[in-house]
């Protein structure tokens, strides 16, 4: 096994244990408002600490980029661990059992390893660049549909940028003319993994951060899917808007959503 993958799995499982225990004791949860509609809990922070501890034991010089602490610079800035210690915090707070740990390892700007762990279902999604994607050691492949007919798509709402809601609804209105249904599940990392597993047929969202999607991005691509921004480019880790699906479905989604894009997205 790739040594960094092994450490990423160890870190994800340790963080998952922290989250699962915290989920059982939500009466003790401490919640803080970070910004509009955006919360952080003591479990987010404890999960992050568990991940950092595992990484630092094996790779003390690597740079770590996390949702809660930002960039923790190491001597080796070429290798970056991009972490969301609890993707789906709102679900966690509300008692909805759908959230995950997301860990990506990027080497000189390219994602080499992706790990997403769902501690409630004990599902471990992994990928190494060029070696395929797996769930609990079983190979993953995207659902290779030819068009949008009968597809179920997952998305998220730009709750931190509510000015984008009209565009979001316009995109959904165009897509529902051909697809079967939507799901809004609340964890971008798991949305991407579910695309890779064929549980949903595609995913699109605006306003996500690199730590939400870096691991899931690789998992989709290694499962035979395509990930791009709303213009068909590769800037999604920085722009925060993306589409993920089998290649033909990505093309169909782009054809539907591009007429709805506001000027700031037409670049």
Swiss-Prot record:
Enzyme nomenclature, EC number: 3.1.3.25
Cofactor(s) listed: Mg(2+)
Positions that bind Mg(2+): 67, 84, 86
Compartments where found: Cytoplasm
Listed Gene3D superfamilies: 3.40.190.80, Fructose-1,6-Bisphosphatase, subunit A, domain 1
Gene Ontology cellular-component annotations: cytoplasm
Entry keyword set: Chaperone, Cytoplasm, Hydrolase, Magnesium, Metal-binding, Ribosome biogenesis, RNA-binding, Transcription, Transcription antitermination, Transcription regulation
Entries under Pfam families matching the protein: Inositol_P (PF00459)
Known catalytic reactions: a myo-inositol phosphate + H2O = myo-inositol + phosphate
CDD domains tied to this protein: IMPase
GO MF terms held by the record: inositol monophosphate 1-phosphatase activity; metal ion binding; RNA binding
Superkingdom, taxonomy of origin: Bacteria
Family: Belongs to the inositol monophosphatase superfamily.
Subunit note: Homodimer. The rRNA transcription and antitermination complex (rrnTAC) consists of RNA polymerase (RNAP), NusA, NusB, NusE (rpsJ), NusG, SubB, ribosomal protein S4, DNA and precursor rRNA; S4 is more flexible than other subunits.
Function: Part of the processive rRNA transcription and antitermination complex (rrnTAC). The complex forms an RNA-chaperone ring around the RNA exit tunnel of RNA polymerase (RNAP). It supports rapid transcription and antitermination of rRNA operons, cotranscriptional rRNA folding, and annealing of distal rRNA regions to allow correct ribosome biogenesis. This subunit may play a central role in organizing the structure.
Protein name: Nus factor SuhB
Organism field: Pasteurella multocida (strain Pm70)
Gene that encodes it: suhB
